[in-house]
């Protein structure tokens, strides 16, 4: 949920008992006021909301060969951590940036440059007690992220597994991701698609095998943060209730959101 959306509709979000994943874009990081963040965090805490944060990602590359690009990326990630600290989140989701085509398959180069970015970010995240969850995006198989996890060897530094991105880009079975990275899963992003667009559909409305995914979670005894990612407000109920069926939870009803809140849901 974009920060500006939360800022404008805090009363609705808190009254409906939502646990938001707050997205701080680069623009939001440049424009937010600490006093607003403190107020929002207090209201969410008063409503016992559980919060996660999603950091900026557009144009950023923690494994960039260009040191100036890495510096901009590190600066943005640092800003996101400081903004996140107001909310005492369960985790902050950031992107690792590996793309086989961009790096010409050179995972070693990407990893070496990535570690230059992540070491100070990881240190600050530990000081703030905010676990970092790296989200899979364009990775075709889990080894780049596995190399990163092994190199850092920090339980505070894990994975946000995105079901939709897996389905779009992975060239290997879901089981291979769980066998390789499952023990590092901090969070799941749950949405569906038909493998031709990042549609962010409610689970069960595309072609992803969520029976297999939840069976693997049980087999590996993984208990992550579950985050639904509908991009349309009319999909919120169906997204939540589809996950409820797998988790044995009660159904969820948003009733009617006010005009304007449906513009964008992360």
Question: Which sequence ranges carry the predicted segments?
Answer:
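Charged helix-capping and loop-helix junction motifs
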Residues: 34-39, 69-77, 107-118, 171-180, ...
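N-terminal pre-domain/capping segments
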Residues: 1-81, 85, 146, 249, ...
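A structural motif
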Residues: 17-18, 84, 89, 185, ...
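Active-site acidic/histidine proton-transfer and metal-coordination neighborhood
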Residues: 63-158
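Alpha-helix-loop-beta-strand connector modules within alpha/beta enzyme cores
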Residues: 40-58, 113-127, 210-213
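Acidic-and-aromatic substrate-binding clefts and catalytic sites of carbohydrate-active enzymes
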Residues: 1-8, 24-36, 61-63, 101-102, ...
